[in-house]
């Protein structure tokens, strides 16, 4: 098995030095779906090669670069530079533009794109192949959606559903996740490790698999006690999830903005209250022992 893995790593590294994987959307339990914070309309989703522009909106998320002039706390992309969560969320919150003719046309085009993709069945491993001719259409279509419908919400158990598009072999999983519940994706130190309950298949040592141009479902669990309280881009109670793989040439991934369902928020608050009560109880017991 180790020998086979070594062969795969060598082969993929030699032929796919620039291959990527990107977070394309977040699907809220409240029925609201928004694109990933790095998504760029027009980026090909049916092409595995860098020459076609398929890597333009993939986030490169390297710890040594985060929070510097080179990359924000959410990384950087080839097509847009440092990732700016505020800029994308401002678009989601632009309620004044939601009924403009070009935005309505973008929504219609995006709906047709989604309908075409919905006819395909998942393959082994849970991934769905991207139809020929597919490109990113979700960004302009999302104009004003959060202003009228709210941000996507977690499920009541605190998990958030995300879609990860694997461009090529070293854009595979498994992924790791971090969630910022306080700074709106601005502060590197605000991110907490989060558990992924549904992951993208792949060799964790290098983010490799044989899949390409496929979409995979991902589910991320909010850290216990975390409550979405960030304010960014005109939105409040914002959480940011940042996902990435272990690709040697990356890591690659992306990020999404969301909030908690009322039930999930209540659970988090109750968890924190229980922790405080337990801490006070321990302190009282220690005083009594003295």
Swiss-Prot record:
Organism, scientific name: Pyricularia oryzae (strain 70-15 / ATCC MYA-4617 / FGSC 8958) (Rice blast fungus)
Effect of loss of the gene: Does not affect vegetative growth, conidiation, or appressoria formation, but redices in appressorial penetration and lesion development.
Glycosylated residue positions: 99
Induction note: Expressed specifically during appressorium formation.
Record's signal peptide: 1-19
Record bears the keyword Signal: yes
The organism's taxonomic lineage, starting at the top: Eukaryota, Fungi, Dikarya, Ascomycota, Pezizomycotina
Keywords for this protein: Cytoplasm, Glycoprotein, Signal, Virulence
Gene Ontology CC terms, in alphabetical order: cytoplasm
Protein name: Appressoria-specific virulence factor GAS2
Gene behind this protein: GAS2
Function recorded in the entry: Appressoria-specific virulence factor required for appressorial penetration in host and lesion development.
